[in-house]
């Protein structure tokens, strides 16, 4: 399971006793979950008013940062295109996989100095992730524009002979050029009509050059034929061709234009390759930064809610549980039995009641502090 439960309970005589009791009830006795202590340093508490306000702000920040983490992960998938099997190896936090990072979580003192107030630390995180989100939008927009232009040109090289680019199909020698009297037309003929075309093309107009047709290219359904005729017979030929279910494609051979299209495709393809490496590196680095910020926000939320629930002095144990998939319901029941004494109203709580300062949706209200962390960021099954 990629789901973790980050919970806290007040210290008994010691926080170690709280840990031992929970671990014995869930992991050692019943194998309901895999557990780790979640280390939160001694943070500055501040006033109760500040904590209540901060609880609301952290809930919003948590949602925002999680959305940025998922956006970066999803965009990494989009950018890697044909190498999607390599996505997970690029989604790391501090160089380790996400499960390892969470289960061995250590507060980053350099990024988020604990001498600062809780509000200041949350503002550092908010500013950092907002900047990453803005950078992501700008980089994604530039890369997507480049990718879109390239795909648009590539689409011209596939599809129907009526619409696709002919730059890689026709050559200069396929046409009569710079003639005052003669011109070359391109005609699309379905494969079933090849015999009919060969039999009739010379008679579709009075001024068709005999034996001038040539098959230049064919796809699964049709062939592209050239035919040479007098310029003044073009309109008559087109009309007769249409009546015989032969499609004349409007095409003017322009070497410079076709060369420019090829050069543009080469340029776009080169630019995309040049941007690919730096973009993947940026995504990798900033995924790590954002994920780390997200888990620190979870730590801040646990700290704030624990103080609001359990009071001062600060005395609680934060614990990370990874539920065994088949035992989720049983685990919840064991935790309820373990901690129901913390909140006598928990058993009869009204789903419509809003509990000030706790900022938990009612379907996730428990007598202990609880937050879910799901590291299945790409929603892979």
Swiss-Prot record:
Q: Which CDD domains match?
A: V-ATPase_C (cd14785)
Q: What is the protein's quaternary organization?
A: V-ATPase is a heteromultimeric enzyme made up of two complexes: the ATP-hydrolytic V1 complex and the proton translocation V0 complex. The V1 complex consists of three catalytic AB heterodimers that form a heterohexamer, three peripheral stalks each consisting of EG heterodimers, one central rotor including subunits D and F, and the regulatory subunits C and H. The proton translocation complex V0 consists of the proton transport subunit a, a ring of proteolipid subunits c9c'', rotary subunit d, subunits e and f, and two accessory subunits.
Q: Which GO CC terms are listed, alphabetically?
A: vacuolar proton-transporting V-type ATPase, V1 domain
Q: What does this protein do?
A: Subunit of the V1 complex of vacuolar(H+)-ATPase (V-ATPase), a multisubunit enzyme composed of a peripheral complex (V1) that hydrolyzes ATP and a membrane integral complex (V0) that translocates protons. V-ATPase is responsible for acidifying and maintaining the pH of intracellular compartments and in some cell types, is targeted to the plasma membrane, where it is responsible for acidifying the extracellular environment. Subunit C is necessary for the assembly of the catalytic sector of the enzyme and is likely to have a specific function in its catalytic activity.
According to UniProt, the name of this protein is: V-type proton ATPase subunit C 1-B
Q: List the Gene Ontology MF annotations in alphabetical order.
A: proton-transporting ATPase activity, rotational mechanism
Q: SUPFAM superfamilies given for it?
A: Vacuolar ATP synthase subunit C
The answer to keyword Translocase applying to this record is no
A Pfam family of the record is V-ATPase_C
What the record says about family reads: Belongs to the V-ATPase C subunit family.
User: In terms of domain of life, where is this protein from?
Assistant: Eukaryota
Q: Which UniProt keywords apply?
A: Acetylation, Hydrogen ion transport, Ion transport, Transport
Family matches, as InterPro entries: ATPase_V1-cplx_csu, Vac_ATP_synth_c_sf
What's the gene? atp6v1c1b
Q: Which residues carry this modification: N-acetylthreonine?
A: 2
């Amino acid at each position: 399971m990629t789901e973790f439960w980050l919970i806290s309970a007040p210290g008994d005589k010691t926080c170690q006793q709280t840990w031992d009791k929970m671990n014995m009830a869930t992991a050692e006795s019943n194998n309901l979950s895999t557990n780790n202590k979640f280390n939160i340093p001694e943070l500055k508490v501040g006033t109760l008013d500040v904590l209540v306000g901060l609880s609301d702000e952290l809930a919003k920040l948590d949602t925002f940062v999680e959305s940025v983490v998922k956006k970066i992960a999803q965009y990494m998938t989009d950018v890697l295109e044909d190498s999607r099997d390599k996505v997970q190896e690029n989604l790391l936090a501090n160089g380790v996989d996400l499960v390892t990072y969470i289960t061995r979580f250590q507060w980053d003192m350099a990024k988020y100095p604990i001498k600062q107030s809780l509000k200041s630390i949350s503002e550092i995180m908010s500013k950092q992730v907002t900047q990453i989100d803005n950078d992501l939008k700008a980089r994604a927009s530039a890369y997507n524009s480049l990718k879109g232009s390239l795909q648009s040109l590539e689409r011209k090289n596939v599809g129907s002979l009526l619409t696709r680019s002919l730059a890689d199909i026709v050559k200069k020698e396929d046409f009569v050029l710079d003639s005052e009297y003669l011109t070359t037309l391109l005609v699309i003929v379905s494969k079933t009509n090849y015999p009919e075309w060969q039999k009739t093309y010379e008679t579709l107009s009075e001024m068709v050059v005999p034996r001038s047709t040539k098959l230049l290219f064919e796809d699964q359904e049709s062939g592209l034929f050239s035919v040479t005729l007098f310029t003044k017979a073009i309109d008559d030929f087109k009309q007769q061709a249409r009546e015989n279910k032969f499609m004349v494609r409007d095409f003017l051979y322009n070497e410079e234009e076709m060369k420019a299209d090829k050069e543009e495709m080469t340029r776009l393809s080169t630019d995309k390759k040049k941007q690919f490496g730096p973009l993947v590196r940026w995504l990798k680095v900033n995924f790590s930064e954002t994920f780390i910020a997200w888990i620190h926000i979870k730590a801040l939320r646990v700290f704030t809610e624990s103080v609001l629930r359990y009071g001062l002095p600060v005395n609680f144990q934060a614990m990370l549980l990874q539920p065994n998939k088949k035992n989720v319901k049983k685990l919840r029941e064991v935790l309820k039995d373990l901690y129901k004494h913390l909140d006598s109203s928990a058993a009869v709580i009204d789903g419509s009641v809003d509990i000030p300062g706790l900022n938990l949706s009612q379907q996730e209200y428990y007598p202990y502090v609880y937050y879910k962390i799901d590291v299945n960021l790409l929603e892979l099954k």
